[in-house]
């Protein structure tokens, strides 16, 4: 009796014999959002396995932090998620303030909220427009980056730097905002909804955009709990989990805002959630500006004491202040021994810092919880069974940045 398989194999063409093959996606692929390398096992166009390789941007941040003072460590946080730098600084400052028991002045707290929401919009503009570009729409990035440029100028006017601001400080913020800047931010916040509407009109009901995103990369509630997702990845699946509401920090409990949630947990729902979050952030920005202008919003922006420098006028008249200033910037302040976890609702998810202090002027150990790291580990689970073209859409809505993933 003849073995039928032999004849079948002979009938296969050369192309059919190599249907199952491995390809490298990245690390210099434009849709890889940084230095991501995916090793994909494909069956024709269908992804059978996806293996993310990370570490190409590893700089040993956590180890470097152990040999720097607390203040010198602050700029490292700008370089983690460099799309929305101030949100990362916020977590570091909160961790130090928890251990030292410092009370942040009300005005500084409101300025922090204002710039955290500006950071959220910076992040979501970049994410939505590059997501559109990944699936073939080239107009949104041109509109979005024009708005990001305006926000970068606000960063520069507040701190002197467009990107790596180092503006938040343990105990408050570096300096007060000029009144003209607050006016300009308010003017911008009234104009920006028009841009959101333009992008909305271009993408939301667009047939091609919908086909490329709907029912792609679905995340269930079980996935969320198993993989430790946070941020938009959770809210896109219908769970209203937001640290600003669930565990209010700074003064978010004084603000009135909604938490947008999706229904299906796919790429399209995550896009819709980000669009609505930008509108909610604008509402928070306008509320923060109103509070900053109110009489109770006036005052100092730093909790003057051991961990913050004295004012310039004090240093001109008091020798103690001058000595304090010198010691603060040479030796640095000492943080009481203990351990603490502080987290913020960063644009990408829950960004946390687990800080272990040993009573010296340098941290004993600092562990950074980057939301993107936990999202990327589910890449295999989310892309399995999808087409190769869908991999770019899934990475896009995961919102990964390799500064924080590789750290």
UniProtKB/Swiss-Prot annotation:
Q: Which GO terms describe its cellular component?
A: plasma membrane
Task: Say where the protein is mainly found.
Answer: membrane
Q: Which InterPro entries match?
A: NADH_Q_OxRdtase_suD, NADH_UbQ_OxRdtase_49kDa_CS, NDH1_su_D/H, NiFe-Hase_large
Per UniProt, the enzyme's principal EC class comes to translocase
Keyword line: Cell inner membrane, Cell membrane, Membrane, NAD, Quinone, Translocase, Transport, Ubiquinone
How does the protein's chain sit in the membrane according to the entry? Peripheral membrane protein
Say yes or no: keyword Translocase present: yes
Source domain of life is Bacteria
So what does this thing catalyse? a quinone + NADH + 5 H(+)(in) = a quinol + NAD(+) + 4 H(+)(out)
The record ties this protein, via PROSITE patterns, to: COMPLEX1_49K
Q: Where in the cell is it found?
A: Cell inner membrane
Known EC number(s)?
7.1.1.-
Single GO MF descriptor: NAD binding
The record describes the protein's role as: NDH-1 shuttles electrons from NADH, via FMN and iron-sulfur (Fe-S) centers, to quinones in the respiratory chain. The immediate electron acceptor for the enzyme in this species is believed to be ubiquinone. Couples the redox reaction to proton translocation (for every two electrons transferred, four hydrogen ions are translocated across the cytoplasmic membrane), and thus conserves the redox energy in a proton gradient.
Family, as annotated: Belongs to the complex I 49 kDa subunit family.
Name the HAMAP family for this protein: NDH1_NuoD (MF_01358)
Name the NCBIfam families for this protein.
NuoD (TIGR01962), PRK06075.1 (NF004739)
Tell me the subunit arrangement. NDH-1 is composed of 14 different subunits. Subunits NuoB, C, D, E, F, and G constitute the peripheral sector of the complex.
Name of the protein: NADH-quinone oxidoreductase subunit D
Q: Which organism is it from?
A: Roseobacter denitrificans (strain ATCC 33942 / OCh 114) (Erythrobacter sp. (strain OCh 114))
């Amino acid at each position: 009796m003849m073995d039928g398989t032999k004849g079948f194999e002979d009938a296969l063409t050369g192309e059919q014999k190599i249907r199952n093959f491995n390809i490298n996606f990245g690390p210099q692929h434009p849709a890889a959002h940084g230095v991501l390398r995916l090793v994909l096992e494909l069956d024709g166009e269908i992804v059978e396995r996806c293996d993310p390789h990370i570490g190409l941007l590893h700089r040993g941040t956590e180890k470097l932090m152990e040999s720097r003072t607390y203040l010198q460590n602050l700029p490292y946080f700008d370089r983690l998620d460099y799309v929305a730098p101030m949100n990362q600084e916020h977590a570091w400052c909160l961790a130090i303030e928890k251990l030292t028991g410092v009370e942040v002045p009300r005005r500084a707290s409101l300025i922090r909220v204002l710039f955290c929401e500006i950071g959220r919009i910076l992040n979501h503009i970049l994410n939505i427009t590059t997501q559109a570009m990944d699936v073939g729409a080239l107009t949104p990035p041109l509109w979005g980056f024009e708005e990001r440029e305006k926000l970068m100028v606000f960063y520069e006017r507040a701190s002197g730097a467009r990107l790596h601001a180092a503006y938040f400080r343990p105990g408050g913020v570096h300096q007060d905002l000029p009144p003209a800047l607050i006016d300009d931010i308010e003017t911008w916040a009234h104009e920006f909804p028009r841009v959101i509407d333009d992008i909305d009109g271009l993408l939301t009901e667009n047939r091609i955009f919908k086909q490329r995103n709907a029912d792609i990369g679905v995340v269930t509630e079980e996935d969320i709990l198993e993989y430790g997702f946070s941020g938009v990845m959770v809210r896109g699946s219908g769970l209203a989990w937001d640290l600003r509401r669930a565990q209010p920090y700074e003064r978010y409990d004084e603000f009135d805002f909604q938490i947008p949630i999706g229904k299906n947990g796919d790429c399209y729902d995550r896009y819709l959630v980000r669009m609505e979050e930008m509108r909610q952030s604008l509402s928070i920005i306008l509320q923060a500006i109103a509070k900053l202008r109110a009489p109770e919003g006036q005052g100092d922006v730093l909790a003057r004491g051991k961990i913050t420098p004295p004012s310039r006028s004090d240093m001109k008249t008091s020798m103690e202040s001058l000595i304090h200033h010198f010691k603060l910037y040479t030796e640095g302040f000492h943080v009481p021994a203990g351990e603490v976890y502080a987290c913020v609702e960063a644009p990408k998810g829950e960004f946390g810092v687990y800080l272990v202090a040993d009573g010296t002027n340098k941290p004993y150990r600092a562990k950074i919880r980057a939301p993107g790291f936990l999202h990327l580990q589910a890449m295999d689970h989310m892309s399995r069974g999808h087409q190769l073209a869908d991999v770019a859409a899934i990475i896009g809505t995961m919102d990964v940045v390799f500064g924080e993933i590789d750290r």
